[in-house]
Structures are given as structure tokens and as C-alpha cells.
Regions:
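Surface loop/turn motifs at the tips and blade-to-blade linkers of beta-strand repeat domains
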Residues: 27-32, 73-78, 115-119, 125-130, ...
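Repeated scaffold domains used in trafficking and secretory/extracellular systems
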Residues: 34-38, 79-85, 125-126, 131-137, ...
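Short loop/turn segments that connect beta-strands within beta-propeller blades
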Residues: 64-68, 106-109, 161-165, 203-207, ...
């Protein structure tokens, strides 16, 4: 699929702050970027990946930054919207759709099946499915793509080496939630556990996972929405509603970054600034 659509972006000013805002889509449907852990842009910022349900089902669209043109590139029945992860070199978008692991070429719209549930089951040694609405992870160098598979009692992290096209089951646990490769080395893969035992990092060299942060159970501490801070080997942790913490994945050293009710917090590429929305109350997006 490679269907060009007319540009529909517009500029306007925020009535309260006066900031100029660039609205990328105006179609009366749900249009959104990938989950906050995944980059929406390629590194060269030639296009932004948008999930749109303007056809009645979620599909992948590229918005060209040069002229605002939209290009639909997916042709599955429906894209699993939160699995979408663009590659940084701008060549591919990786995602699930129709119970398949896929990647689509951004230049041609040609899609390639990377894994089926039957192939995943052979890797896991039991019947599994690809859970809906769950994020995937692509390493910073675009080499490794990590996905999740689920059986009746276990969760698995499966990793594709995109150079050799070989899959490997690298981790299994009672639950595997969000995953993200460390931007400084693909050897570390953050694998969130359940909300009650959240922060785990898989050392892919040894196959061993370590809990790098222990929540305060007595005070019902809520840790969520973890993400790497580039250049630091640290994970930022939303300690909702009390602020943001950072923990070093090797030393376990903890520091506090912020003390407001951040919800989704993500760092810039340099690891020097973060942006975060806020939750209960919603007081807008903050930079820190």
C-alpha cells in the first residue's frame, strides 16, 4: 500500500499562551503518534508516523515534513496501534497487525511478515498469542526488534536480529509489560513487570534480569512509565503523583528529578531535558 492523501495540516495560536501550534491532521477521526516510548520521527525528521482510523480501522500513515502530505503505507485489516515502532534510519515501521509481526518499507509501502504466532509458539515451547495493545521495542541502532508473546500463564520477550533475520526467546516472566532498549547499548533491555514489581532490566549478554528498583510497598508507592535517559544508563521512573526518579541500571543509585505529578515523561536525545504531561490534575505539559 502506498496511497498519497492531500495535506491537511494547519497552524494556529494557543489562546492562553500565545504559542504557535502546528496541527498535523484535521480529519474527523482518531489520529495519533506511537506510544511515548517510541519515536514518532526518523532521525532525519523526514516524516512522522501517524496511526489513523479514518478508514474505520487503524492504519499507518507517514506525514512528510517537507509539504505535509500524508501517505498510507499499511494494508493489513487493522494495525495494532500501540505496537508501532519506526526505525531511526527512516526505512521501516515495525508493528503487529492481523496477529502477525510486520515491518513496512516507508519508501514503497511493501510489507514483510517477520513472525507468526505459530513461529512464536515454537520459540516459546507452548501455544502463545501476540497480546493486543502492547508496545514493542527497537534498539537505537535499528538492529534488534523486541516483541511480547503470551501463553495462559507466562509472558515472553522475543527478539529479532534484523541483520541475520533470526528470532530468539530471550526472557520469560509472570508478566512482561513495556519494553525499551537502552539508547547507549542494546545489551540492556528494560522489561517492566506488574505494577506491584515493576522495574526490571534484562542483561542480554547473560540472559539474566535484575530488579533495579524496589517500590515502597508500605506507602503504596506507584511506579510507572519508565524510560531511559540517554547517556546516563539511568531509567527515569514516574513516582506518581510525587514526581520523577532516576535509577542507574548498574549501580542502583537513585536520584530525584522532579516533584510534580508527571505522568508520561520522556527525555530528549541528549539526556538533558524531559517533557511530561500531568495527571490528576491535568495542568498541561511541562519541560524540565
Amino acid at each position: 500500500m502506498y496511497q498519497r492523501l492531500p495535506a491537511e495540516d494547519r497552524w494556529f495560536s494557543d489562546p492562553q499562551t500565545g504559542q504557535r501550534i502546528h496541527q498535523l491532521t484535521t480529519h474527523p477521526s482518531i489520529n495519533h503518534h506511537p506510544f511515548f516510548l517510541s519515536p514518532a520521527w526518523d532521525d532525519a525528521m523526514r516524516h512522522i508516523v501517524i496511526v489513523s482510523d479514518r478508514t474505520g480501522k487503524n492504519q499507518l500513515n507517514l506525514l512528510q515534513t517537507a509539504d505535509g502530505t500524508l501517505i498510507r503505507i499499511s494494508d493489513v485489516e487493522e494495525v495494532d496501534e500501540w505496537t508501532v515502532h519506526p526505525s531511526r534510519d527512516g526505512r521501516y515501521v515495525y508493528y503487529h497487525g492481523d496477529a502477525l509481526g510486520l515491518r513496512t518499507d516507508c519508501a514503497t509501502g511493501q510489507s514483510e511478515i517477520l513472525i507468526t504466532e505459530e513461529e512464536a509458539a515454537r520459540l516459546c515451547g507452548e501455544s502463545v498469542t501476540f497480546p493486543l495493545g502492547k508496545t514493542t521495542a527497537l534498539s537505537h541502532d535499528d538492529r534488534f526488534w523486541a516483541i511480547r508473546a503470551r501463553s495462559a500463564s507466562r509472558w515472553y520477550a522475543l527478539v529479532l536480529d534484523t541483520q541475520t533475520q533470526k528470532w530468539k526467546m530471550e526472557y520469560e516472566a509472570e508478566e512482561v509489560s513495556h519494553m525499551q532498549f537502552c539508547p547507549d547499548t542494546p545489551d540492556y533491555l528494560f522489561c517492566a513487570g506488574p505494577l506491584t514489581d515493576r522495574v526490571w532490566v534484562l542483561d542480554r549478554r547473560t540472559g539474566q534480569a535484575r530488579r533495579v528498583f524496589q517500590r515502597d510497598v508500605a506507602h503504596k508507592q506507584w511506579i510507572t512509565h519508565e524510560t531511559w535517559i540517554p547517556g546516563t544508563l539511568e531509567l527515569s521512573l514516574v513516582d506518581w503523583p510525587h514526581g520523577i526518579l532516576a535509577v542507574h541500571c548498574e549501580t542502583g543509585k537513585i536520584r530525584r528529578i522532579a516533584d510534580f505529578n508527571a505522568w508520561h515523561a520522556i527525555s530528549n536525545e541528549q539526556g538533558t531535558m524531559m517533557a511530561a504531561d500531568t495527571n490528576f490534575p491535568d495542568v498541561g505539559i511541562r519541560l524540565l
